[in-house]
Amino acid sequence: MRKYNSLDKALIIYVKYIVVAFVQSSPNRNKEGIIIIMDKLLDLTRDFDAAKAAFEAYLDEYDRADDKIHLKIVHTYGVVDAAEDIARRMGLGEEDVQLAKVIGLLHDIGRFEQIKRFDSFEPGTMEHAVYGAQLLFGPEKMIRRFVKDDRFDSLICTAIEKHSDFKLEGITDERTLLHAKLIRDADKLDNCRVKLEESMETLLGVDEKGVGEGVIAPKVWESCMAKESVLSSDRVSKVDYWISYIAQYYDINFPETYEIMREHNYVKRIKDRVPYALPETQEKMDILAAEMEKYMDERIRNKK
């Protein structure tokens, strides 16, 4: 995924001066307007850098050496990159790109306290998305540590609060809905990487063999065949969790996200990470992966 670093920022500055030189050579060019646009781009980059610095300071309150904390730190920056990649492929304006990055940076801020208190990612221990929104936008207004401008408070709050909802509902504002969908896609996209790179013990508390020994619950398989995400409460065995990680990709909003997933061959790689003890389980995993890839290709082809 595309990462923007100090060299990219230097390039923006360089381009700014090239543009200035160009418009100065032609009196008919609106050089003031172009310079304002370039300055705005630099301001947006600085805004994200300031938010990132504040986030790093916030992380100092937690044990970075803890495997689950480390996972979520890496995941956070993975979601930032994923949000930017999706947004740029969609052709969104720079303000929306930077806004998507900030939401990605803060989307899981509630996870760190959940891990500190419960050493768990389970939704039954804490609704981390709701908690994160309350933490940022409650009486103390922690959001001001990260974002000085309050124009997007409602949008950011809603996107964070709803990013882990089973179904995205109840948003009427068009731009807020865009970013709520975008963070959900970016979150799922980086979770593909997480499921391949993190140790299975950190993810599910057992090794790959232990995951593959289970039987897929009937309700879980029904959801998979209905092309729906799996309810957390329906999962019984570790293999239920694993198959649910693939089924959740039916709930992707933008074809650009599917394009990235196909480029990385994520679905097959996630399926193949686990050795399934029962032929029936292997067969069902193969069926789901094939159906998922067919669905993804159709969405990409139809661009919707």
Where does each model-flagged region fall?
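Short, Lys/Arg-enriched N-terminal segments with co-localized hydrophobic residues
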Residues: 19-37
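Divalent metal-dependent phosphate-bond-processing catalytic cores, especially two-metal-ion Mg2+/Mn2+ enzymes
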Residues: 39-46, 68-73, 77, 81, ...
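Low-complexity, intrinsically disordered or signal/transmembrane-proximal segments
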Residues: 4, 14-17, 24
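Active-site flanking loop/helix segments enriched in acidic
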Residues: 52-78, 110-122
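An active-site-proximal "capping" alpha-helix that borders the catalytic cofactor pocket
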Residues: 78-86, 127-140
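Acidic/histidine metal-binding catalytic segments
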Residues: 91-102, 142-161, 175-182
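His-Asp-centered metal-binding catalytic motifs of divalent-metal-dependent phosphohydrolases/nucleases
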Residues: 97-124, 132, 136, 155-166
